Amino acid sequence: MANADTPHYDRDFLLSPAKRNQIVELWEVEKFGRDSFGDPGAVSLYGMTPGQWHARGVRILARTTLEAVRDPLGNRIGEDVARIAARAPPGSVFGVVDPFAGSCNGLFWILRHLPGAEGLGFEFEQAIFDMSSRNIESLGASIKLVHGDYGKLLGQHRFPGAHHIVAFLAPPWADALSAKAGLDLGRTKPPIENIVDEFERIYSNNPILYVTEVHERLVPEPLAALRTRFEWSELNVYDIPGPTGRHGVLLGAMRWNASGALTGR
């Protein structure tokens, strides 16, 4: 439990080498919420408060407390995806792919808004893969989580050609986010355009909706370059506070527009 010597639970502390891969206790999750948001219930995951998901057996690492897509953001992302998915031809089948699955909460919320869709996640880091595998199993979530580098495995676990693909792209930002310039989408790890290249190589004939998590402040040039890659795009920033500012998504579609349902940038 917290005492007078307990450090401030913020981004720097949770990502520190000594703390980042430790399993955090419930009081620590609530302290991070209180210290960073003024709300001990801020780290809501899988549709539950911290107390609820902890009681269900869900456990997370210190870094996941900060890095996970929290429920309010996940819900808004899922709503936007469902809005675009509704414009696909009747009877369309959807596969949702998250190459940087982490907690799988972003994937969880997109699937929640796309009933019947299949979910596939990739996670490179063993500690996070092990933790998230146990969590989604305890929740009975319809997500297939694969351990390894998505770049090497994407083609081995591809959805059929008839599927509409939703690609949720939320790679580590690392130093791509700066207080001065905002988020540089060309400096994420890996750059967003490189990830798009991989998906276009594997899913060259599938309709794809790219859903890229973004910050409220974006370096203009990489954003503009990325948007030129898509046949249609839309930028949405949500009024939901985060540890470093508001987050949102850049939606970008390829081959989704056969019916002319998506127009403009």
Language-model features: locations:
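S-adenosylmethionine
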Residues: 161-234
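S-adenosyl-L-methionine
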Residues: 1-91, 95, 125-163
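Alpha-helix termini
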Residues: 82-93, 157-162, 197-205
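Class I S-adenosyl-L-methionine
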Residues: 227-265
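Conserved SAM-binding loop of SAM-dependent methyltransferases across substrates and taxa
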Residues: 103-116
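Class I SAM-dependent methyltransferase core
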Residues: 98
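Conserved SAM-binding motif I beta-strand of class I
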Residues: 118-123
